[in-house]
């Protein structure tokens, strides 16, 4: 049975989810029946078709009034500011992909359910009272049929947690620290302008800008054994897309660089195939643009100090990789229902 999807919020993640659905060939498994976005329909169609990061969409795109066609597939366009006014019941929506970045509480999820949706998947971390937080490849098998309000965590959480789990299973992590080197985002300024965070008042293209991150809390939410054992900081850098994560962990088992790289390279071709990739090529951030993996380990940058301190560099396309995981988790939510019946 084809899963009927609605996308609420057609920004960076919403558009990339729709593009990824077609580029991955999964539109027979999932069908987008509606998109709710306050912007004009003409702009929605234009930005879907032409993207500075990811290039021109390979599928034909046509828009007329409040309808969008991708090839022969027709999608209804809505422009409603209140969740309660969305016609999810009439459209028989199975899963709402909540990509607005505005909503993240259980009450917000329940509003979608009251509007008639079967389930809700947030494209960002939500409150502790959600039914589940999923990092695909690590804990999607814990999804139950009764889990109706789910978070897909964050792009950086999806990037680093598979690597942390692999290192912990093999070498027993005691503690860790993470530095996220993240591309500029749309909550920053093109030129100096007001923002509640004084660092984000500054022009994104001219500075490396430290910002707050809840990544350590996100790690603990999915891997609770690491509560109070990880710290994280984040800086935004003046690039358009792709993020690097510097991960340092202290482990109980004495290790060497070769052992760490062997572990991660093997996982990329076996248990974490399609989620984690591994490279030893002399690549830079732009080379990972449009990469669908959650994490790409750069084996040339692995270091071990004193046999017990491991440092790794992990890349991710913070848009495209995460968009693909949104689709994976949507299918996992549907499988949980199917397995229970």
From Swiss-Prot:
E.C. numbers: 1.2.1.72
Listed GO CC annotations: cytoplasm
UniProt: substrate binding residues: 154-156, 200, 213-214, 236
A GO molecular-function annotation: erythrose-4-phosphate dehydrogenase activity
Superkingdom as given in the UniProt entry: Bacteria
Keywords (A to Z) from UniProt: Cytoplasm, NAD, Oxidoreductase, Pyridoxine biosynthesis
Disulphide linkage map: none
Residues annotated as binding NAD(+): 12-13, 318
BP GO annotations: pyridoxal phosphate biosynthetic process; pyridoxine biosynthetic process
Active-site feature positions: 155 (nucleophile)
Localization, UniProt: Cytoplasm
Pfam family, one: Gp_dh_N
Record-marked site positions (Activates thiol group during catalysis): 182
PROSITE patterns reported in the protein's UniProt record: GAPDH
Protein family (similarity comment): Belongs to the glyceraldehyde-3-phosphate dehydrogenase family. Epd subfamily.
Name the UniProt record assigns to this protein: D-erythrose-4-phosphate dehydrogenase
Species name: Edwardsiella ictaluri (strain 93-146)
Organism taxonomic ancestry: Bacteria, Pseudomonadati, Pseudomonadota, Gammaproteobacteria, Enterobacterales
